[in-house]
Amino acid sequence: MNTYLKKSCLIFISLFGMSLSLSFAQLSEPLPFMTHAKPLSAEIVDLGMLDTVPSTAALVRLPNRKIVYMVKEQGKWEPFYVKAIETGYWDTRYEKDTDYDSVFADMREMGANTAYVMLHWEDIEPADNRFDYSFADSVVAAAGRQGLKVGWVLFLHAQKERVPSLKPETAWTFHLDDRDSSNYTMQWVKRDGKLYSNIKDILDYGVRPLHVYGHKEIFYRVRRMLYQLARHYRFDETVIGVQLGNEEGFSFLDESDFNPVTAELYKEWMRKTNKTDYAQFKKEAMDWWWQQFTSAYHEGDPYKIISFNLDAAQAEAGDPERVAMTGTSASTYADGNLDVIGTMFYKGWGYKAILGLDHRYNNSYNYQLPILIPSEIGIGRFNSPVWFRHFIAHTLERAAQGFGVYCYGEVRKELPELGDVRNELIRMLKNISLNEDIIWEGLPGPGAVSCQVDEPGVQVSHLNKNGQETLALIYFPEAKEITDSSRVSNLRTLKLNCMTQKERQYKVDIYKNGECIKSNSLSLKAGISRSITVEGIRMDDIVFVSIR
């Protein structure tokens, strides 16, 4: 056998062995509680190495150092900016014989490219170690037929509102250690001095049952389930990632956890850390459990993203009581090894949450994990139009890699009374799509041209693509607080002052409500400002200005 042939055979054998190791890799053994180990995050791939990635989705570092998301479409890598609408228990999953093809076609018609779909642990593991993906696969197939991606919103807990089933008290994961009429795999809570240790009693009283994540019967099963989920969809072109839990943590409604299993974990934590503060125990335990869970997922799939969210963003906002109760905060996303900050933006706590997240991540949103992709920006009943627009603007100006809108039940086509809300979403998604190349690749700050508006109270934020092309976002921050509708609706003419340090001809396109309302060719000289007038602007508008 000649040397060339020998080398070829060795390469083939090596690759074949690597392929086998990938195909038959096993999940690592669970670590003892609070054992230090470096967690596994999603791989970040340099753009030049993208074609070597054995996946259908990946986090990619661009030459400008920004981390972006890309997906493989028909064998070709493409930029992907997440524009998601969430659906699940409180709209489509409560309906009999939901036609997901129709649901996803409707989302696509509105301009979404992703469906965030609620999926329960019991949907894919209906009995212990018996995995069944028939429901999940049918959802994925329908989304694929309609040209949508799927991000799973993976529920672990139960809720009175038929989560995960019509009889949530029968959820098998809460009955792995039943003794003395109590469920030991569930957090025990107190309300008004009364202890609840049984899932039926908790549900009857309206409390949300949550697992003891460190219980030996729960801990390894969550890891196993996440690993299996990751392996099942690793090479699927429709599934782009998963949100690990929906509003999980220690109970945020009541005092917890009075389960003796958790008491033993607390004692173990004290022995291993020489600390005693119970709120600190909750924080460090949550961080460690989520590190182990995310690592298990990435053992199964090193590339697709895993996110998380916290109830109403109250913990991200730094509410002391919520932080102490739940063991979560703005830092949870980094300390818990999440790839994505999947926060929520609603009127109640949204702005304080932004401040809390900025304090923790302001210099790293774009350059290291976790990146920002809010999971729920409320629309319809959950945010007024101006609040919705402003939360989108705050997401864009931080150069996030997408967002999710909550929820489909507020915008679906067959409910004509929701027409105004639906059109609100359509217009916003259209504005974004028309400028998506700058938004996806762009970083905060102006490019070759910077813009200013002289009128008091106007915010101008910039994104730039490689220091050249610019997208300016113009809005009135105070509009969300104004109750005088006539003041808000009064039409204004804004004078947009443009300046560059690079003399040349620029094309300026101005967008509002999903349409280009003005297009100009602007000749700029270095250091000399020129203005463009923008007519017909309301205080609750958001204006997109692209300069190329």
Locate predicted features.
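N-terminal carbohydrate-binding accessory modules
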Residues: L27-A112
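Aromatic- and carboxylate-lined catalytic core of secreted/periplasmic carbohydrate-active enzymes
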Residues: T35-A37, D46, A393-L494, K502-Y506, ...
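Aromatic-lined substrate-binding rim segments of carbohydrate-active enzymes
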Residues: D99-Y184, V189, M286-G300
